[in-house]
Every structure is written in C-alpha cells, then in structure tokens.
Design a protein with these regions (language model features):
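Short helix-capping and inter-helix turn/linker motifs at the boundaries of alpha-helical repeat units
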Residues: 5, 165-168
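A short secondary-structure junction motif
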Residues: 17, 21, 151-158, 203, ...
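C-terminal effector-binding regulatory domain of bacterial HTH transcription factors
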Residues: 1-3, 187-211
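Alpha-helix C-terminal capping/termination sites
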Residues: 96, 182-183
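Conserved amphipathic alpha-helical segments that form helical-bundle/coiled-coil interaction surfaces
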Residues: 100-162, 171-179, 188-198
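Short, flexible turn/loop "capping" segments at secondary-structure junctions
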Residues: 27, 59-60, 128, 169-171
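Charged, alpha-helical scaffolding/interaction elements associated with membrane systems
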Residues: 20, 55, 118-119, 183
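Short linear motifs at protein or domain termini
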Residues: 1-96, 208-211
Length: 211
C-alpha cells in the first residue's frame, strides 16, 4: 500500500477543518500547536501551511503561524468541481488501461463492510486513500496524479453525515467504481466517480452552511 505523505495528509486534515468551519476566518493557526496535536514534527506542518497559502486559504505570518482567510461556498464548489472533472477522468482512464489491483482493493472493501461498526478512523482513511491513489496510478498520467494529490482533502465526514453512515455509503461507492474499472466500463466508471465526489461536496457544503 502506498503511504500517504505527511505533507499531503496534514494538508488534507487542515483543509477539511477549514471547509467544515472548525477553523474560521481570522483564526490563528499555530504551527507548533498543530504539530503537537497531530504528533508530527514542525516540518510537514510548515509544508502544509505553504500549500494552503498557495491555495489562498491562509496567510502566513512571520514566526507566528498563519491566519485563516475567508472561505465562501463558491471556493468549496470550485474545489470539488475540479476534483469531479479530474478524478472522473482518472477513473475512466483506469478502466481503459486496466487496474490489476482492483480485485485486491475490492476484497479489502468487502472485508471492511463486514466490520464497519468497529472500523477505526485511521483504517478507513488509509483504505480510502489507497483506493483513490490506486485509481490515479492506473490512469497512468503523472501530471494528473500530482494535480489530484494537491486537491486531496480526505473523507468528507461531518456532523451532518454520521461517521458510520459515511463509511457505509463511501465503501459501497468505492466497490461500485472499482467494479466498473475491472469490467473496463470507462463510461460508467466516470459516472460512478462523479456521483461519489458530488456526494462529498454536498456533505461539505451542508457542514459549511451549518457553521
């Protein structure tokens, strides 16, 4: 399994917190505090801050961490529309190219379904990332892979979507996508991925409205 790079993982965690409203406009983000909270060194947090600043989500302060910038619904919609465009294309390409590891991933997902109530957050997130990056890899386009990696923001779990409910829906959607890829049905793989990301976007937007 491909491990989630620390910078990408932390960027995804912070991006999800920004989108859900855990961090609001004007809030100060302490590099040291976040590193301690996540149990990592300051280096990957600093790299995550730089990535978030490049996206216009935060403003870096010299030796003082960062300040959260205003985020509106259009920013979130634009972000997810890009994921829909690129990730649905990746799924279609994976179906055309073939994805040998699809069977193994489907087995892992079916196993996860059997023990859904005891599935840990980290286990779910690792499997979620493994499915998506497996599809990106099978698409066989390094530029596309890097763009999707930069857009990655992890699972869209929030108080409007209970964790178990999200796990159940997302896991079945992953199985559906991989089954289409396995059958080399590029058109359906594209559609299944579009619907998968659209549901994530809808959940994040619901969280945003209830902030």
């Amino acid at each position: 399994m491909e491990l989630l790079p620390a910078r990408v993982r932390i960027t995804a965690i912070l991006k999800k917190a920004l989108f859900s409203g855990e961090y609001k406009s004007g809030d100060e983000l302490s590099l040291t505090d976040i590193a301690a909270k996540l149990g990592v060194s300051r280096t990957p947090v600093r790299e995550a801050f730089q990535a978030l600043e490049a996206e216009g989500l935060i403003e870096l302060r010299m030796n003082k961490g960062a300040i959260v910038k205003p985020i509106d619904e259009k920013y979130i919609t634009d972000h997810y529309e890009m994921r829909i465009l690129l990730e649905s294309e990746a799924a279609a390409r994976a179906a055309k190219n073939g994805m040998p590891e699809a069977d193994k991933l489907i087995e892992k997902l079916l196993d996860a379904q059997k023990r859904m109530e005891s599935l840990s957050t980290s286990e779910y997130e690792d499997l979620n990332f493994e499915v998506h990056t497996g599809i990106w890899t099978a698409a066989d386009n390094m530029r596309l892979y890097k763009m999707l990696s930069n857009l990655w923001n992890g699972p869209s779990i929030g108080f409007t979507s209970p964790k178990l409910d999200h796990y159940i829906k997302s896991t079945q959607e992953h199985i559906n996508i991989l089954t289409c890829i396995k059958k080399k049905d590029a058109k359906k793989a594209r559609k299944e991925m579009e619907q998968h990301i659209e549901r994530s976007m809808d959940n994040i937007l619901k969280n945003f409205k209830f902030r």
